[in-house]
Amino acid sequence: MKGSRRVRAIRVAGRAAGRDYQGRSWVYFLLSAQTRGLSLGVNLSPSGACDYRCCYCDIPKVSALHRAPVDVQGLALELGAALDFVASGQVVHEPSYSRFPKEWLSLRQVMLSGEGEPTLCPNFVEVMETLVHARALGRYPFFKLVLETNGSGLQRPEVQQALELFTAQDEVWMKLDAGTDSQFHGMSGVDTPFREVLARILELGRRRPIVIQSLFASVDGSPPARGEIQNYVRCLGLLQEQGAVIQRVHIQSVMNWVESSRCTHLPLAILSEIACQVRRELGVEVEVF
Ligand code: SF4
């Protein structure tokens, strides 16, 4: 059971600590460079259900057919307790967090994420309603909601319905690790046509601003070729031209503790070069982790 792990190893770059469930099943603490502080994560994929097989993902995956619902009553209890804990300031006395600056330990956001793809969660609407309700109670300082997704379940009517509950301050972070079919298939491990991935990003990006999350790695010993990066930047430019509003781009790599025989970390100099190219050609805010 996920909740039995005290600290879950993380799968992407930029996170200063692991997922800290502290005995809970659905809600974990996460210190993240991407959010410059403490987040609460909600695990919408307890079974690890995901329809991608990213070459850098360290979480054992099961088929998307094995998706399981979230116990929303349990989630509400865990979320309330975790929010109370953060609001009380006790988190600064936790041994695993005491070495971090105090300003990192106030709550930045609540993330819909987890061990697999959150938009595949069968009761996504109920989860979202639970989070929005906790925020509407007004017992805690305002926190934004962030959905971290590969986009594959975004077309589901219940996900579309749930996203109507997002305010302008909330964010959707969408995965885009490639600029061509072959690069996408190599990174994601699936044969979904790349144009479908871009269409999903475009569709949402026309409705609300999105944050693009891109992970680049050295795969089988080779860093991404210059042409691949150019194609990736060109895709972002086309999305913009066609009406997607890109609020920010996150550029990151595999961290060394989740490196595999296939995927290893890219040096900061290469990540910074990619970030500069995106900034120059798109004129959007880019952060490197
Ligand atoms: S989409 Fe996310 S959870 Fe799914 S395989 Fe890729 S990194 Fe892992």
Whereabouts are the PLM-identified features?
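A short small-residue
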Residues: 57-63, 109-112, 209-215, 253-255
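N-terminal [4Fe-4S]-dependent radical SAM core
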Residues: 1-47, 53-55, 59-77, 81-106
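Auxiliary Fe-S-binding modules of radical SAM enzymes
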Residues: 1-35, 221-289
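Short aromatic/hydrophobic contact patches that present stacked aromatics
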Residues: 39-43, 109-111, 146, 173
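Conserved AdoMet/S-adenosylmethionine-binding subsite of the radical SAM
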Residues: 119-266
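Conserved Radical SAM active-site core
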Residues: 59-168
